[in-house]
Amino acid sequence: MSKILVAGNPDYGLSKAIKFLYPDATFVSRTHGNLDLSIPSKQRELAELSMDYDIFIAVSCIWRFAQTEYVQEVAKRWIERKHGYIIAIGSSADTPVKGTAWMYPAEKKALRSYCRQLSQISAGEND
């Protein structure tokens, strides 16, 4: 059985649905595990913790591009050690249909772009 780590609050939204499907998964957030993932030192702590798991799911979206930053921290370690699977939850908001000053679409677009880069590594396109 795979060990799953989820960055997200299991009492809310998509993380709650993941908890229903995978009740043995471990969840971390400000309220679960005392990890405020907007703080770089906590992102590094998450990355180290993730090494004990086979699958990492990034659900928690935190302002100022923190979701992309904490996915990067996890990915750096996992790439170095050829470890597991990363699933990052994006949003259709990354392709807005009208102009907006809201940063959320830009943050999700950055996450999508970063994850595409990661997929090229896993596909061996850098060899």
Where are these regions (language model features)?
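Canonical Rossmann dinucleotide-binding motif of NAD(H)/NADP(H)-dependent dehydrogenases/reductases
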Residues: 1-28
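Rossmann-fold scaffold of SDR-type NAD(P)-dependent oxidoreductases
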Residues: 7-8, 53-63, 70-71, 85-91
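Short glycine-/acidic-enriched loop or helix-start segments at secondary-structure transitions
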Residues: 15-17, 67-68, 98-99
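A glycine-rich helix->loop->beta "capping" turn
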Residues: 22, 45-58
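Adenosine-cofactor binding site in Rossmann-like domains, unifying the SAM/SAH pocket
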Residues: 25-48, 62-69
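Hydrophobic/aromatic beta-strand patches that form the interior of the parallel beta-sheet core
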Residues: 26-28, 57, 87, 127
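Catalytic loop of short-chain dehydrogenase/reductase
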Residues: 61-62, 79, 84-124
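A short helix-coil junction within the Rossmann-fold of NAD(P)-dependent oxidoreductases
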Residues: 66, 73-82
